[in-house]
Amino acid sequence: MSSKNKIIQELEAEQLKQDVPEFSPGDTVVVQVKVKEGNRERLQAFEGVVIARRNRGLDSAFTVRKISHGIGVERTFQTHSKQVDSVAVKRRGDVRQAKLYYLRELTGRAARIKEKLG
């Protein structure tokens, strides 16, 4: 039995995005984020490796990590947020774990992820 009220479930189902591509930890993705600067809005791309996914319906989120000027940057995005314009998968990674937090300690060639073939 579900712990959420039926009305709440229906409201959440309306807000779910339908155009979210299938991606998993280890994949390299480009996330287009809406950024508001003053009175104008633009898209900003954030490209990196998905190190974690959290699947909770409307509260689903994923964490993307990239190295910018030698410094590791991680951003967590809400999958169904209006701020996230699009998610594009650039390359599929071949990993065995669901959470890739160990990449935080690795640098350079050690932090590379094998590409999934086939």
UniProtKB/Swiss-Prot annotation:
Keywords: Ribonucleoprotein, Ribosomal protein
Family: Belongs to the bacterial ribosomal protein bL19 family.
GO biological process assignments: translation
Recorded GO CC terms: cytosolic large ribosomal subunit
Source taxon at top rank: Bacteria
NCBIfam families attached to this UniProt entry: rplS_bact (TIGR01024)
Molecular-function GO terms, alphabetical: structural constituent of ribosome
Function: This protein is located at the 30S-50S ribosomal subunit interface and may play a role in the structure and function of the aminoacyl-tRNA binding site.
UniProt keyword Metal-binding, yes or no: no
Annotated organism of origin: Saccharophagus degradans (strain 2-40 / ATCC 43961 / DSM 17024)
Name under which the protein is recorded: Large ribosomal subunit protein bL19
Alphabetical list of HAMAP family matching this protein: Ribosomal_bL19
